[in-house]
């Protein structure tokens, strides 16, 4: 049967519908077409196949068939082998509310033990709940770079213990802190070896004294006496190394694995604070000093509290560090200066449970950095799986806040202390391992609590226990009677082992060919007693009445038969559930195409074979989530900022924030240039304030929203300024009016005066006596006077 597309079932009914798709719905019955000859082979065909061991089964009826078909053929119900997969809870202590009191009795994961019984190609669902309990004990180990460049930082943290205890005791009543220091391997070329005095005082040429160089030293075991932290820090002095990178990874490894020296408690959150202003050496760098022995991940801190293997063992690799940090349930905090923050950000993407903070040049902000990092760690729950058998595959669905089910996710963010989240897990088995019982562990990163899953691979039939060797039912002892059929011994054939290979007759050849003229046993077997005995092959199994089928002639895709997602039957691929295509290379699942905003391919493409094909111009990324030129690039992220940062907006009102917004929110004072893939966005909120943020996705695929802490809001009016302004305006207006009035009067007077002057200039008066004027004297002439 050629592989063909099958409709994708709902995740809750994958088992039933997926099985039916291969056993008779719209196609041949796979149980009867695989040519199986034993109960064990029948169970491996499909989860829907059953085997009948009833001796009274009518002749010609298949023993491997659907259960309902076997019952129709009058197979006794007690003779039907049909194991059913199941999940049983073995241990289920209730989740705790608080971590105070006896911390060994605190439970943050439920259930604690589960037993799975799975038959081949079957799956089973189970769930796990996780709660971040309140007032949980905390261990903080402060690991400091004591190279010369950190001299001012050492002075800044002399009172850190008291301040840290004051802040952290707002979150937990059970705090312990410790201290350790590192520089680098005390061997050339990492240290100064000449002149001789440089060995005792590496700062000889700087007119000062510092400690001889050391790799790592443990200073203070975890203690609740915070004043001792201050005292021990004040006793420390810096040293000096020759090259720029430090030996911090050596220190991290020893602080992680030396449980007894450090004092890590089993029932506490473990924080390892790593502070430096420089790069760090990694695995294989030790070869510069001729150190070729790989790091063994063991504790080598001696009675003097110094790392004794510093000069004989290479630096640890990131993989080894990740393994040990996970085993010890330690959350690593990189507190590094801005010049190296990008490097340690890349490291954190490879180490689960790690956070990065920017350390000021004098470490003055380390207190707030630790508190913020602890809050970030406690706001996230992420599951990790250990020792998963290769025959098993797991798929996750997360139920975070507000009972929102998010398919394909095994982490929840934005949590508060006391919140409870759950995860639905589907375990599916392929094949039958030699070891029938195995176990694996599921645990939240950084938690001591875990879920242990015990798996039993149900590949055998119960009737095999009643097998009769050399049974009289098999032609007087020529075979073993097992599960209703004879398993013939060497040299015997037939349904009852009645035919010997030595009894050869030429007429039997015709019974070994499907049609006249066709090759006997398809040229891949011998005809004995009228039955084909198929040849063995190094490539796989040859089966069928005429040896016409095999399980190795199917097409290969990327070097794997049927892409590793199906079984080869008679040259055709029979695809597993959730897979289709001629090569079984196309998944029908769409959760891999689900973007962080809850839309298929971010609404910019279509999902084909489990991958997004971006349609909208300018969009790219695994889920078409990146599209700087798209008009909605900032629009949707704006809603996430409003919801997750400011607890408002449409998504907040609809309680769908965690479903659609899986971004990590980080508050910053100002936006920085994080590369060409970063998208800067700006919008006005309901208060008419301008909010600026940056959308960035790092190399691991984690989406981060950097939001400026304080929105730029228009300032309200200053009453005093307004009052003075009004009064000033009134005075100015009055003064201006007076000035204008005075100006107008002056202009008018000048005009009148000019007119007067003009008229006076035009006036021309004749000389004459005033007719009204009378002189003071009057002269009269006496006409009678004649004079003498």
From Swiss-Prot:
The modification Phosphotyrosine is found at residues 773, 785. InterPro entries: EGF_extracell (IPR013111), I-EGF_1 (IPR040622), Integrin_beta_N (IPR033760), Integrin_bsu (IPR015812), Integrin_bsu_cyt_dom (IPR014836), Integrin_bsu_tail (IPR012896), Integrin_bsu_tail_dom_sf (IPR036349), Integrin_bsu_VWA (IPR002369). One of its GO terms (cellular component) is lamellipodium membrane. Mg(2+) binds at residues 147, 149, 246. Changing residue 166 to I: Probable risk factor for neonatal thrombocytopenia; alloantigen Duv(a+); does not affect significantly the integrin function. Residues 1-26 form the signal peptide. Residues 135-377 form the VWFA domain. Ca(2+) 2 binds at residues 184, 241, 243, 245-246, 277. The keyword Repeat applies. Residues 203-210 are annotated as: Involved in CX3CL1-, NRG1-, FGF1- and IGF1-binding. One of its GO terms (biological process) is apoptotic cell clearance. The constitutive activation of ITGAV:ITGB3 on neoplastic cells may contribute to tumor growth and metastatic potential. Integrin alpha-V/beta-3 (ITGAV:ITGB3) is a receptor for cytotactin, fibronectin, laminin, matrix metalloproteinase-2, osteopontin, osteomodulin, prothrombin, thrombospondin, vitronectin and von Willebrand factor. Integrin alpha-IIb/beta-3 (ITGA2B:ITGB3) is a receptor for fibronectin, fibrinogen, plasminogen, prothrombin, thrombospondin and vitronectin. Integrins alpha-IIb/beta-3 and alpha-V/beta-3 recognize the sequence R-G-D in a wide array of ligands. Integrin alpha-IIb/beta-3 recognizes the sequence H-H-L-G-G-G-A-K-Q-A-G-D-V in fibrinogen gamma chain. Belongs to the integrin beta chain family. This is Integrin beta-3. It comes from Homo sapiens (Human). The gene is ITGB3.
């Amino acid at each position: 049967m050629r592989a063909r597309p099958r409709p994708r079932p709902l995740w809750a009914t994958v088992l039933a519908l997926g099985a039916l798709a291969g056993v008779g719905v719209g196609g041949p019955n796979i149980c009867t077409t695989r040519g199986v000859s034993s109960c064990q082979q029948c169970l491996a065909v499909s989860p829907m196949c059953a085997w009948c061991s009833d001796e009274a089964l009518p002749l010609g009826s298949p023993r491997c068939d659907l259960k309902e078909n076997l019952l129709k053929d009058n197979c006794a119900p007690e003779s039907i082998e049909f194991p059913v997969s199941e999940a049983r809870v073995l241990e289920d202590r209730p989740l705790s509310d608080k971590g105070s009191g006896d911390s060994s009795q605190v439970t943050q994961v439920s259930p604690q033990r589960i037993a799975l019984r799975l038959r081949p190609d079957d799956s089973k669902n189970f769930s796990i709940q996780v709660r971040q309990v309140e007032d949980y004990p905390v261990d903080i180990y402060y690991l400091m770079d004591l190279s010369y460049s950190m001299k001012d930082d050492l002075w800044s943290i002399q009172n850190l213990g008291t301040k840290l205890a004051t802040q952290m005791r707002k979150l937990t009543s059970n705090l312990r802190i410790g201290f350790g220091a590192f520089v680098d391997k005390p061997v050339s070329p990492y240290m100064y070896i000449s002149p001789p005095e440089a060995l005792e005082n590496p700062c000889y040429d700087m007119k000062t004294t510092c400690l001889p160089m050391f790799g790592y030293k443990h200073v203070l075991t975890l203690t609740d006496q915070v004043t001792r932290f201050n005292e021990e820090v004040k006793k420390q002095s810096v040293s000096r190394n020759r090259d720029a990178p430090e030996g911090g990874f050596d220190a991290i490894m020893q602080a992680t694995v030396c449980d007894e020296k450090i004092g890590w408690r089993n029932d506490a959150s473990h924080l390892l604070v790593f502070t430096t202003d420089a790069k760090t050496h990694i695995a294989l760098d030790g070869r510069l000093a001729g150190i070729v022995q790989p790091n063994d991940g063991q504790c080598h801190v001696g009675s003097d509290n110094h790392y004794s293997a510093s000069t004989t063992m290479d630096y640890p690799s990131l993989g080894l560090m990740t393994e040990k940090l996970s085993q010890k349930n330690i959350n690593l905090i990189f507190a590094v200066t801005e010049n190296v923050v990008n490097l340690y950000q890349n490291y954190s993407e490879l180490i689960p449970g790690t956070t990065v903070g920017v350390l000021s040049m004098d470490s003055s902000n380390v207190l707030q950095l630790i508190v913020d990092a602890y809050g970030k760690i406690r706001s996230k729950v992420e599951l990790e799986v250990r020792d998963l058998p290769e025959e098993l595959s797991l798929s996750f669905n997360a139920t975070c806040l507000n009972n929102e089910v998010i398919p394909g996710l095994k982490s929840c963010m934005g949590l508060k202390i006391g919140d409870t989240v759950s995860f639905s897990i589907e375990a599916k088995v392929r094949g039958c391992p030699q070891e029938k019982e195995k176990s694996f562990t599921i645990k939240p990163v950084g938690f001591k609590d875990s879920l242990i899953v015990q798996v039993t691979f149900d590949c055998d039939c119960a009737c095999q226990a009643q097998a009769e060797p050399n049974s009289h039912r098999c032609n007087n002892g020529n075979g073993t009677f097992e599960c209703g059929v004879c398993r013939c011994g060497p040299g015997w054939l037939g349904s009852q082992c009645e035919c010997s290979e030595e009894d050869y007759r030429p007429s039997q050849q015709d019974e070994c060919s499907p049609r006249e003229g066709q090759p006997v046993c398809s040229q891949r077997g011998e005809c004995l007693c009228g039955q084909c005995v198929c040849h063995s092959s190094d490539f796989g199994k040859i089966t069928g009445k005429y040896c016409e089928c095999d399980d190795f002639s199917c097409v290969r895709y990327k070097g794997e038969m049927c892409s590793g997602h199906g079984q080869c039957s008679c040259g055709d691929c029979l695809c597993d559930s959730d897979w289709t295509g001629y090569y079984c290379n196309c998944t029908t699942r769409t959760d891999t195409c689900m973007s962080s905003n809850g839309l298929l391919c971010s609404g910019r493409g279509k999902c084909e074979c489990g991958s997004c094909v971006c349609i909208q111009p300018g969009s790219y990324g695994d889920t078409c989530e990146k599209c700087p030129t798209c008009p909605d690039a900032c629009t949707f992220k704006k809603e996430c900022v409003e919801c997750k940062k400011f607890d408002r907006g449409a998504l907040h009102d609809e309680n769908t924030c965690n479903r659609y917004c899986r971004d990590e929110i980080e508050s910053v004072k100002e936006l920085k240039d994080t590369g060409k893939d970063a998208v800067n966005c700006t919008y006005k909120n309901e208060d008419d304030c301008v909010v600026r943020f940056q959308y960035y996705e790092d190399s691991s695929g984690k989406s981060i929203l950097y939001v400026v802490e304080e929105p730029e809001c228009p300032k309200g009016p200053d009453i005093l300024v307004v009052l003075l302004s009004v009064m000033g305006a009134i005075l100015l207006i009055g003064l201006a009016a007076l000035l204008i009035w005075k100006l107008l009067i002056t202009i008018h007077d000048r005009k009148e005066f000019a007119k007067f002057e003009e008229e006076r200039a035009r006036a021309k008066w004749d000389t004459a006596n005033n007719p009204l004027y009378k002189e003071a004297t009057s002269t009269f002439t006496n006409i009678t006077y004649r004079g003498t």
